[in-house]
């Protein structure tokens, strides 16, 4: 969490801070991403999604404490690190979603896609529950 691995510094403290600090404005967050309200309780640092409000973020993405950071890959390659829970989760699928502005309508009209889109948050919820977090 602080830029070291096994006592060896690999990132400066400043780099870690910038990566894990939300850099998006309220105006940026007004716009959906991939047809979903991605920014609810989240922001984006340098190349990482960052949980800014766990209460708002949890219903859409599953649990993750304040400061949890992740990579929400558009094609299903997703990971999350929750420093407060000392937990790292990996969820890797390969799926080419509809990336158009009409993505939400495409998902709404396809029950299989709707289930696929909810699989990752279910995975997160079940993992936290199984670990008693």
Give the location of each predicted region:
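Catalytic loop of the DD-peptidase/beta-lactamase superfamily, centered on the K-T-G motif
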Residues: 1-133
């Amino acid at each position: 969490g602080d830029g070291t691995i096994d006592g060896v510094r690999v990132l400066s403290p400043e780099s870690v801070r910038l990566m894990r600090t939300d850099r998006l404005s309220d105006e940026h967050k007004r716009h959906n991403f991939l047809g979903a309200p991605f920014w609810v309780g989240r922001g984006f640092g340098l190349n990482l999604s960052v949980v800014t409000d766990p209460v708002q973020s949890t219903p859409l993405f599953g649990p993750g404490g304040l400061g949890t950071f992740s990579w929400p890959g558009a094609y299903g390659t997703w990971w999350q690190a929750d420093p407060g829970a000392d937990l790292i989760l990996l969820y890797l699928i390969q799926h080419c979603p509809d990336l158009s502005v009409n993505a939400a309508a495409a998902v709404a009209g396809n029950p299989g896609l709707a289930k696929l889109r909810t699989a990752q948050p279910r995975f997160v919820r079940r993992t936290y529950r199984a670990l008693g977090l």
